Amino acid sequence: MKKRILRSSAILASSVASLFPTGAAKAEKPGEVSKKFRESVLSRPDLKSADPIGQVDPPPEKSRYPWRVKIVTTTFWVGEAPTKNNPVPNHISAWDAQWAKHFGGTDDPDPARRTNFFPAKFVPRQNPFYVALPYNDVCKDGHKPEASRVIPWFKEAYEGPGKTVCKGRWIAIRFKDRVCYAQWEDAGPFRTDHWQYVFGTERPKPNLNRGAGLDVSPAVRDFLGMGDTDVTDWRFVDFDEVPRGPWATTGDNNTFVINDREKGTRVVSAADASGRSK
């Protein structure tokens, strides 16, 4: 019996020893094991992006469009008068010479004069969730030379020479733990030619507004809870990625509204056809 116990103990000791490389079973100095463990963990490439409290960055999203992060973001609005830091009046846009008229008036940014993301005085005739990015795809001679090459959706959205493929495009804006969706309706801030940032990997160019690279409407500002000037992330999104929300309810230019109207027309037409066939 005693021999069996000794033999079993020897087998167990041999199995434990096999788990360590040669010499690993010798005594370590105090703290040496924990030091080696820390070094082995910190040498792992998947943990090198950990933040100070040890949380590993999440894997990148699999999306057609990447996030542009930490972009200085300013608030602008339809009908805005020119100022020192905004020399271009916003009663017109890069693609609409009567923007304020088509919108229905000035999109007053004062929170005290707004309700439910709308200016209190009227219901906008266009989507109050809008943005500006520093690129315009058209010029007096048609599309800019680089437009067909750098705009990812150019071919699928092309409707003829000189007709913008950027106006109305949806983007997502992220601030802290909230994400808002809005339509691209103007070019700016300051520039209309920076395709290397809008569609590429460059950062926004320096300007009078702390290097701002995105303008957002008062509705976007209010939904996100951001300041008039703040820092956000943004990216383009295809329409089928946009969930319904307050950005889906209003505006003749709003993809949701347009689609809902078309569905309603088809339903009415089908009902009329059914009635006539009886």
Predicted feature locations:
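Bacterial Sec-dependent signal peptides at the C-terminal "C-region" and cleavage site
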Residues: A17-A27
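Secreted/periplasmic proteins
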Residues: A27-K278
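Bacterial N-terminal signal peptides that target proteins for export
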Residues: K2-A10
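Bacterial N-terminal signal peptides
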Residues: S9-S18
